[in-house]
């Protein structure tokens, strides 16, 4: 390790010396900003890739390209820009001039090249270096592995290097951008209005999670980074905007895992005069449409599985799912909602399936934990799980036929939750009581229980029409579309512990 650091320091020193040479011999202190590119690599490949050598010679096509030097192969330089790669040819005269002006070029340097487009003997396009300019001298060498970094932590800490050398990473983040754009376009076509709501809240709400706390100096009050935009978006529906959506960050002061990052992106939307079943239909249509648009198919590989977004998706209640994935457990097979309402029964059952419980957990929390332990990891294909207990769904409307559960679902793919939606609770008095129950739970030790939000109750008292709302985790959805299995691979700069 020490030898590697010494070698790297030697290379950096050599490059700094070259930069000093450039500063003395070139304008703009060695960092010019007048070169203008005419074409990207992919544009030239698409337009001229099928031409013969003779056809290109006859065309005499002049171009200007710019990019990072990724390899040197004899007289050829491999340049990389955002679209791909193309070669530049330096004859002996050019090579001598490069050495004289720049003390030679290194891997990682960024250059601009003007010249005629040609075809090499191996059938590769290249630009003859007739005019050229060093635009940025790279002072640090790229990793020795041409096809990417081997150390995962370095990839996350130095994403800029990862993006330079790892094509898979570049493609993953291009796909992320396409997924977000496709979702936005889908929602706009469905007549939803995109809005922006506060990122700092006086009262955190909209989800059960531990918030980040900050201090507003001018107001001299504690504020919270938002854990969800839900309560503000529903205020907008009260105000008359019947279809709204927001794509933005949420912050939850919780642990790191392959599926959790404290800062993550959600698309949350609300539609008046709809219920949770309408959300399910809309979600199926959205994901099927996006898969076809971006991948050309509704089926995509994910690890050892093939995820089918074609629909219709599986739908079952939480209780049904627990029974389905525990066929040999006689107690579970005989369980009804009457048993689920019995706290002693649920604690014993949770213990029997290997769950360490908290004393303040309710019957609904215990049911959800049993589901998460025994059923959730097995939900590989798109599946809507309905029938969430009211005591863990403080913002959802109670089901008409069973007031223990709500008109809520969570959507699972690949063994993890991707979305959460429900028919909204628009009964101001019921919401008031549920907020009070959440305060009691927080006092009993549940750090993730919600706060009481008096202004939101006031908003509901003005009248929220029948409404359904849903949040979709963008990061987890992108994991599926890019066949990656850790959330850090689809977040450009994931949370990391500072280096010593």
UniProtKB/Swiss-Prot annotation:
Q: Which residues bind Mg(2+) 1?
A: 410, 417
Carries keyword Nucleotide-binding? yes
Q: Pfam families, per this entry?
A: tRNA-synt_2, tRNA_anti-codon
Tell me which residues bind Mg(2+) 2: 417
User: Can you quote the record's cofactor note?
Assistant: Binds 3 Mg(2+) ions per subunit.
Q: Main location per UniProt?
A: cytoplasm
Please give the catalytic activity noted in the UniProt record. tRNA(Lys) + L-lysine + ATP = L-lysyl-tRNA(Lys) + AMP + diphosphate
Which GO CC annotations does the UniProt entry carry?
cytosol
Q: Which UniProt keywords apply?
A: Aminoacyl-tRNA synthetase, ATP-binding, Cytoplasm, Ligase, Magnesium, Metal-binding, Nucleotide-binding, Protein biosynthesis
Known cofactor(s): Mg(2+)
PROSITE patterns noted in UniProt: AA_TRNA_LIGASE_II
GO MF annotation, one: lysine-tRNA ligase activity
Cite the CDD domains for this sequence: LysRS_core (cd00775), LysRS_N (cd04322)
Q: What is the E.C. number?
A: 6.1.1.6
Question: One GO BP annotation here?
Answer: lysyl-tRNA aminoacylation
- UniProt cross-references to InterPro entries, sorted A to Z: Aa-tRNA-synt_II, aa-tRNA-synth_II, aa-tRNA-synth_II/BPL/LPL, Lys-tRNA-ligase_II, Lys-tRNA-ligase_II_N, Lys-tRNA-synth_II_C, NA-bd_OB-fold, NA-bd_OB_tRNA
Q: Where in the cell is it found?
A: Cytoplasm
Family stated for the protein in its record? Belongs to the class-II aminoacyl-tRNA synthetase family.
Assembly, per entry: Homodimer.
**Record protein name field:** Lysine--tRNA ligase
Query: What organism is this sequence from?
Result: Shewanella amazonensis (strain ATCC BAA-1098 / SB2B)
Gene for this chain: lysS
């Amino acid at each position: 390790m020490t030898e590697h650091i010494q070698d790297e320091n030697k290379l950096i020193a050599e490059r700094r010396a070259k930069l000093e040479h450039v500063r003395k011999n070139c304008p703009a202190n060695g960092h010019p900003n007048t070169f203008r590119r005419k074409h990207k690599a992919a544009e030239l490949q698409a337009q001229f890739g099928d031409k013969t050598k003779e056809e290109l010679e006859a065309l005499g096509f002049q171009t200007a390209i710019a990019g990072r030097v990724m390899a040197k192969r004899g007289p050829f330089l491999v340049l990389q820009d955002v679209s791909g790669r193309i070669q530049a040819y330096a004859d002996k005269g050019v090579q001598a001039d490069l050495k004289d002006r720049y003390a030679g070029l290194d891997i990682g340097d960024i250059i601009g090249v003007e010249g005629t487009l040609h075809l090499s003997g191996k059938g590769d396009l290249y630009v003859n270096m007739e005019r050229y300019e060093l635009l940025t001298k790279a002072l640090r060498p790229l990793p020795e592995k041409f096809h990417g970094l081997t150390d995962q932590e370095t990839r996350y800490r130095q994403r800029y290097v990862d993006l330079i050398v790892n094509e898979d990473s570049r493609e993953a983040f291009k796909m992320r951008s396409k997924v977000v754009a496709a979702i936005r376009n889908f929602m706009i076509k469905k007549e939803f209005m995109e809005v922006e709501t506060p990122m700092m809240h006086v009262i955190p709400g909209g989800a059960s999670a531990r918030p980040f706390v900050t201090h507003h100096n001018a107001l001299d009050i504690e504020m919270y980074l938002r854990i969800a935009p839900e309560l503000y978006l529903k205020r907008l529906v009260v105000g008359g905007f019947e279809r709204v959506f927001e794509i933005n960050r949420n912050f939850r002061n919780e642990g790191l895992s392959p599926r959790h990052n404290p800062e993550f992106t959600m698309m949350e939307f609300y539609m008046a005069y709809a219920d949770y079943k309408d959300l399910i239909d809309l979600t199926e249509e959205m994901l099927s449409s996006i898969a076809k648009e971006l991948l050309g198919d509704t089926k995509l590989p994910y690890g050892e599985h093939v995820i089918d977004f074609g629909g219709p998706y599986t739908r079952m209640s939480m209780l049904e799912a627990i029974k389905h994935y525990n066929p040999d457990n006689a107690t579970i097979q005989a369980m009804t909602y009457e048993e689920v309402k019995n706290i002693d029964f649920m604690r014993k059952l949770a213990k029997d399936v290997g769950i360490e419980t908290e004393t303040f957990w309710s019957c609904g929390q215990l049911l959800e934990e049993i589901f998460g332990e025994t059923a959730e990891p097995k939900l590989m294909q798109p599946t809507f799980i309905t029938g969430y207990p009211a005591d863990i769904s403080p913002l959802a409307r109670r089901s008409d036929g069973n007031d223990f559960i709500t008109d809520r679902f969570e959507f699972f793919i690949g063994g993890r939750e991707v979305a959460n939606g429900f028919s909204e609770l628009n009964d101001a008095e019921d919401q008031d009581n549920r907020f009070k129950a959440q305060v009691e739970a927080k006092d009993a030790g549940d750090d993730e229980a919600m706060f009481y939000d008096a202004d939101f109750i006031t908003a509901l008292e003005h009248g929220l029409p029948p409404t359904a709302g849903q949040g979709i985790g963008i990061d987890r959805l992108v994991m599926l579309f890019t066949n990656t299995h850790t959330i850090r691979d689809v977040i450009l700069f994931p949370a990391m512990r500072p280096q010593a």
